[in-house]
A protein has these predicted regions:
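Transmembrane helix segments
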Residues: 14-23, 136-176, 180
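Small-residue-enriched core segments of transmembrane alpha-helices in multipass membrane transport
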Residues: 33-43, 115-125, 147-155
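Short helix-loop junctions at transmembrane helix boundaries
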Residues: 92-112, 120, 124, 134-140, ...
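Hydrophobic alpha-helical transmembrane segments of polytopic membrane proteins
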Residues: 113-136, 154-157, 208-216
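Transmembrane helix-boundary elements of multi-pass transport/secretion proteins
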Residues: 1-64, 73-93, 103-114, 141-144, ...
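Alpha-helical transmembrane segments of multipass membrane proteins
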Residues: 11, 15, 96-101, 130-131, ...
Length: 226
C-alpha cells in the first residue's frame, strides 16, 4: 500500500487535468501539480508511517528490549532510519516512473533530479517522524503532530500563495521550514534544463534538516518509558 498510494493519486490527478486547457508555451496543469505531489507526498506519508510505527514499537516494548543490549541509541535510530528510507526510496522510484514514463510528466530538467529530491523529501519525513515520535505517548498523539509539524509547511512553502507575496513575518517563518526549500528545488528542476545553484543549495538545506532531526531524535530517545 505504501508503494502504490502515491502512484494511484498521481494517476487520478492525470485524468482530473486531462481536459483542462493549457496555455501555449506554458507547463501543463498536470505537470505543475504532479511536481508538487512528488515533493510533498513522500514527506507526508513517511512522516506519518515513521512516527506511528516508532510509537507502536515503544508501546509494545520492542524498542526497550533492543536498548537493553549494548546497541547505542544513535545506531538504533540509524537502523530504523535506513529501513524507512529504503521504503521511501522505493515509493519515490515507483511514483517517478509512473509520472514520467507512463503519464508523460515533462520537466525542463532531468527526471533524475526530481527522483533525487523526492527521496530527500521522504528522508526528511523519516527524520521528522523519528523526532516527533519521541514526544508522543500514544499513536493518537503521534498523529496529532501532523497538523502541528506538516500543515504549516504545506501552507507556507509556496503551494497556495507564492512565498514572495507573503507578509514579512510569514516569509521569515517560511524561510525556517524545510518544505519551502524542497518545493523551490523542484520548481528549479521543472523550469531549468541544468541543475541550478539554487537547487543545489535547497537540496543541501533539506538534507541538513533531515540529519539534524535524526540527531535530535537520537538525543531524546529514552531507554525506559515513563
Amino acid at each position: 500500500m505504501i508503494l502504490l498510494v502515491p502512484s494511484l493519486i498521481i494517476t487520478l490527478m492525470y485524468f482530473m487535468f486531462a481536459e483542462v486547457p493549457q496555455r501555449p508555451g506554458a507547463p501543463s496543469p498536470f505537470d505543475n501539480a504532479c511536481l508538487i505531489i512528488l515533493g510533498v507526498f513522500p514527506l507526508i506519508v513517511m512522516f506519518l508511517i515513521t512516527s506511528i510505527t516508532m510509537q507502536r514499537e515503544r508501546v509494545s516494548g520492542t524498542r526497550e528490549r533492543i536498548l537493553t543490549t549494548p546497541l547505542r541509541r544513535l545506531d538504533l535510530l540509524a537502523a530504523y532510519g535506513t529501513a524507512f528510507s529504503i521504503a521511501a526510496a522505493a515509493q519515490a522510484t515507483l511514483a517517478c516512473v509512473v509520472s514520467f514514463w507512463f503519464l508523460g510528466l515533462n520537466t525542463a530538467g532531468s527526471p533524475v533530479w526530481v527522483f533525487v529530491i523526492a527521496i530527500v523529501n521522504a528522508v526528511l519525513g523519516v527524520g521528522l517522524g523519528l523526532l516527533c515520535s519521541a514526544f508522543a505517548r500514544t499513536e493518537f498523539q503521534a498523529v496529532q503532530f501532523m497538523p502541528l509539524v506538516i500543515a504549516p509547511q504545506l501552507l507556507l512553502c509556496g503551494i497556495i500563495v507564492p512565498r514572495a507575496l507573503l507578509p514579512d513575518w510569514l516569509q521569515w517563518i517560511s524561510n525556517a521550514l524545510p518544505a519551502s526549500y524542497a518545493l523551490e528545488a523542484l520548481q528549479q528542476v521543472g523550469a531549468y534544463p541544468e541543475l541550478t545553484s539554487v537547487a543545489v543549495r535547497d537540496i543541501a538545506i533539506v538534507v541538513g534538516f533531515a540529519v539534524v532531526a535524526m540527531g535530535l531524535a537520537a538525543a531524546t530517545l529514552r531507554r525506559r518509558t515513563p
